[in-house]
Amino acid sequence: MTSETSPDLAAALAAGTLVLDGGLSNQLETAGHDLGDALWSARLLAERPEAVTEAHLAYFTAGADVVITASYQATFEGFARRGIGRERAAALIASSVDLARDAVRRARARGVARPLWVAASAGPYGAMLADGSEYRGRYGLTAGELERFHRPRLEVLAAARPDVLALETVPDADEARAPSVVLLRGVAAGSFVGAESFVP
């Protein structure tokens, strides 16, 4: 999943240090957007997509090499609670990558010449619950249930062609295995995957 304008991310990481953005939600809140919502920054994919692009662009122009998309809490289940159907939800999830790519193009237009990358964020099951349980895990779900939760969103994100899939705040080994199984079964064949875990 390599960008048309940047070298392979895995090779770049092997060669040295890259600067990750300072947190999409931080920039959005600094710009005055209220993220006190079960969808968190994903709400803006539907309501204020331009704000998401502007936040990514601010990080690129400030020196970030990699930005993380607004898809951490973008799930089919979360959107369904807002009355958003699966087709529209899939489009919104995919748009998180498109908005970040637009920020890459705008950064280029402003003279940013260094390599830039887009990391598609996928939060844990607890992020969809929006009750803080992404820091604890222990959802009482089987590995198969967790795999079925992660698969549809990972399929959409992979199809949107980010440079990396970022599995964020995975709270325990059981959940970490679920997206790994999905990816190993070819959902994102050829992709580079980054993972961040938090074990209490």
Regions found by a protein language model. Give the residues of each.
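Domain-level signal for soluble alpha/beta catalytic cores
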Residues: 1-200
